[in-house]
Amino acid sequence: MAATEAAAADSAGPAPGVPATPASTRGAAAASSPWRPPESRLQGSRPRPARARAAAPVPPARELIQPTVSELSRAVRTNILCTVRGCGKILPNSPALNMHLVKSHRLQDGIVNPTIRKDLTTAPKFYCCPIKGCPRGPDRPFSQFSLVKQHFMKMHAEKKHKCSKCSNSYGTEWDLKRHEEDCGKTFQCTCGCPYASRTALQSHIYRTGHEIPAEHRDPPSKKRKMESYLQNQKLSSKTTEPLSDQAAPRQDAAEPDAPEVKPAASLEDSCSAHTKKQSVATPPRCPQKLLLPKPKVALVKLPVMQFSPVPVFVPTAESSAQPVVLGVDHSSAAGTVHLVPLSVGALILSLDSEACSLKESLPLSKIISPVVEPMNTGVQVNLGKSLCSPLQEVGSVCQRTSISSSNVQTDLTYASANLIPSAQWLGPDSSVSSCSQTDLSFDSQVSLPVSVHTQTLVPSSKVTSSIAAQTDAFIDACFQPGGVSRETQTSRMQNRTNDSVPVGHTGLCGDIFESVHASYSVPTDTIMSSSLVAETGTHGLPPQSDPKILGQVMEKSAPVLNFSTQNGLLPAHTMTDNQTQTIDLLSDLENILSSNLPGQTLDNRSLLSDTNPGPDAQLPAGSAQNSGIDFDIEEFLSASNIQTQTEESELSSMSTEPVLESLDIETQTDVLLSDPSTQPYGFRAGSGFLGLEMFDTQTQTDLNFFLDSSPHLPLGSILKHSSFSMSTDSSDTETQTEGACPARHLPALESKVQLSSTETQTMSSGFEPLGNLFLTSNETQTAMDDFLLADLAWNTMESQFSSVETQTCAELHAVSSF
């Protein structure tokens, strides 16, 4: 430090005993400096030897500027408006204004478009103090104007700012503030020697080599930054700390200022202590919340729709709630939540639900949703009130057939009136099955592009209703022509429970939320193109040993099973030839099947291949598209349902391709419970409201399978190629089929006059001999010419198929003797 002060004294003035250097000589030396004048060197630096200066190249002459006192004493300009017309930007000070002019407007010293980089050929500018006798005169100028101004304000300007503790005065407010930080303090060395300033203490330490105290190690600027940082931290922590922590007084405020020598604590120690205190006292700002609670009971104001992997809660058009997709994995842990746009949710029916709750007794592991299993949800929706919204087009409900949903299981006590404006739904005690629509075939082994899985949870104490429609083409505006759509409604009453055998599929009704294996899938397929091949799968019915029974003691009435086409939704396609076959399971049915099917092995999940011997070998080439039919003899014998096999003919004049290659497009109805007080369904002519409808196995059978070279058509030939589901009900069943078609959609052909209505009534008794299996009376017999209109070569099967279709015999042997 002494050497530095001596060097500063040498540079300020000639030391005693050293010859003074004339100003001209110093100016010449400055001019001969290779980089910059010696006056601009750092304080205490040694001058370069004369030999080095002489050998270096001569730089360009410097430009010395001596500002006036008025310029130096002028106050610093703030909030300066840009001088360029139209700019309007306000700069905080003059240097910022100059930088703005150069960077934004390319203006510098009145020159348009100057280069940003300084020209190295220009002479450097230096600024000297204008006060005579000042050591920072022309011999020791400053390299910047701000430096000479700072020097002038500190050394020569009027000292207007006085300290309140002492008599010192300062020319600038900043100097006074810096002085007040150390005014009255004593800086003591570790040896005990006190000093009035930190600078004097540092000089002492440099001379003696003593250890600097910890409180004086950091410079004042760093201390100020640390103190401001700590102050900001305290202000932010006060917002989160409890009131008890805020009441604690600060340690530095409690300390008295009386002693002249103030021992300061270590800055690092104080920082660490404050950090520790903050970490302990400050609670987390945002406590962690679980993404989804454990779904024991959920109240949802949204209708329910399910895609293949996860269930979807879709809002209505008027609802402002966000749709939520809830996924549940196998380990009973809630998965992720996805947001679904409302355009996707427009596929579901518009339902206004009161509450959606999961059963508390249902384990969460039973709500898993595998793609290959038919049952994958346990969502139960209770709908309270009906909607009075006007009837909308079905096309607005279903945007595209590519948006698919499958494997839906619901227990709906009410539904929207969008689909049935002409009749109100039942009371809150009724149950409604939801609709499903998909473009993927999961459980069919024929060339069908569409498969629907619909399962209905039906309490035994409720009369249930079902909307079970597979839709490929609602209207021409929404779908491509050529699709076939059919909606059926069914009602049937089970009047006795004393003699009834436990119904196999009732396990779905009682234990749908308790056992995954007690359910079965229900595919319903509609053929659109013979080139589309869908995936196949096998599904069976639940075992017969399920102890729960659907039947209840109800007064015996004539139940009606109604099938009718929905002509209002399909103006371009007419559905005809509705055939109903009802088979009740008897104890010796297995023997009959075994005798009629000697060449067919009936195992669990067995499939009938295309290469079966017998009538299949003589099929024409046009019927080769038929694949195997899923047939399970054990589930076939243990099932309890009424299976409806429907052949439908597309009589549209626009369709010229033989679409009647494959028949038995739809398989409808399981066990039906009806109520005499049910109101008719809005879209069906002369049909009762749906009771309980459980879709069963899908079958699609080529009519050529009914052909045989032998003059006789055995019952096994029918059952082998059709997936019949047997019924063991003790109640009498009456089946009525109505297929009314508007005359405007039918071509003016004689052979199609009789196609306008086909009505078949079938009476069957569960525990009577097998001879009464087909007791059928036909009120209207469909002519065989309607099958010839589809360009199918069925000339050899007219008599055989008409016999199968009408079934006018009173005994079973009459069917097999054709």
Curated annotation (Swiss-Prot):
Residues 1-34 have a biased composition (Low complexity). Residues 1-62, 210-284, 603-625 are annotated as: Disordered. GO terms for cellular component: nuclear body. A zinc finger (C2H2-type) spans 80-105, 161-181. Residues 219-437 are annotated as: Required for formation of RAD51 foci. Keywords: Activator, DNA damage, Metal-binding, Nucleus, Repeat, Transcription, Transcription regulation, Zinc, Zinc-finger. Disulfide bonds: none annotated. The keyword Repeat applies. Residues 210-221 have a biased composition (Basic and acidic residues). Residues 229-243, 603-612 have a biased composition (Polar residues). It comes from the Eukaryota. GO terms for molecular function: DNA-binding transcription activator activity, RNA polymerase II-specific; dynein complex binding; transcription cis-regulatory region binding; zinc ion binding. It holds the Pfam family C2H2_ASCIZ. GO terms for biological process: DNA damage response; motile cilium assembly; positive regulation of DNA-templated transcription; positive regulation of gene expression; positive regulation of non-motile cilium assembly; positive regulation of transcription by RNA polymerase II. It is found in: Nucleus. Transmembrane segments: none annotated. The keyword GTP-binding does not apply. Transcription factor. Plays a crucial role in cell survival and RAD51 foci formation in response to methylating DNA damage. Involved in regulating the activity of ATM in the absence of DNA damage. May play a role in stabilizing ATM. Binds to the DYNLL1 promoter and activates its transcription. Interacts via its C-terminus with ATM. Interacts with DYNLL; this interaction inhibits ATMIN transcriptional activity and hence may play a role in a feedback loop whereby DYNLL1 inhibits transactivation of its own promoter by ATMIN. ATMIN. This is ATM interactor. It comes from Mus musculus (Mouse).
